[in-house]
Amino acid sequence: ATTPFGMVQVSPNTITGGDNGSGYSYEHETIEGFAFTQMSGIGWYGDLGNLLVMPTVGDLRTNSGKEGGVAGYRSRYDKSSEEAKAGYYKVLLSDYQIQAEATAAPHSGMLRFVFPENKQSRIQLDLARRVGGTSTYQAVQVIDDHTIAGRMECTPEGGGWGNGEGSSRYTVYFMRSFPNR
């Protein structure tokens, strides 16, 4: 989900690494999470895919796992439930029975998750992840019971941009608010 000339591109991400600059590939069977920075139409790029968010229920899993079998917090998704149009995306995360929605405004992105009742639910954040590697520095500040802010710095040392052979350096600043519902 994005807007013309928008500063964020909220998208499901199906795999880290590989030929996946947009973050999403239809042939994959699982979603690793939803990221707020993407590039599309450029082939393999190896950067962005930052601020990964994944809703989960049940036992805590601290890594994403791998497409095709290694357990983690990623989830299979119901392709027939996908709805995508300009500025909006919706899908059912089958393993958790969570409905996920994404939308964007010119300067922000929003996610909404509908969790199954009577399940231990959580929203997991991966601040180190980027499509082609990891960010090299992360900082988080807890603002209040429902808000965090911070930044992540991405440099060639963390991979990306041709496996770190380029000189891509960028910093992503963020603020996240979590309603108490």
State the predicted function of each range.
Residues 1-181:
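Accessory carbohydrate-recognition regions in carbohydrate-active enzymes
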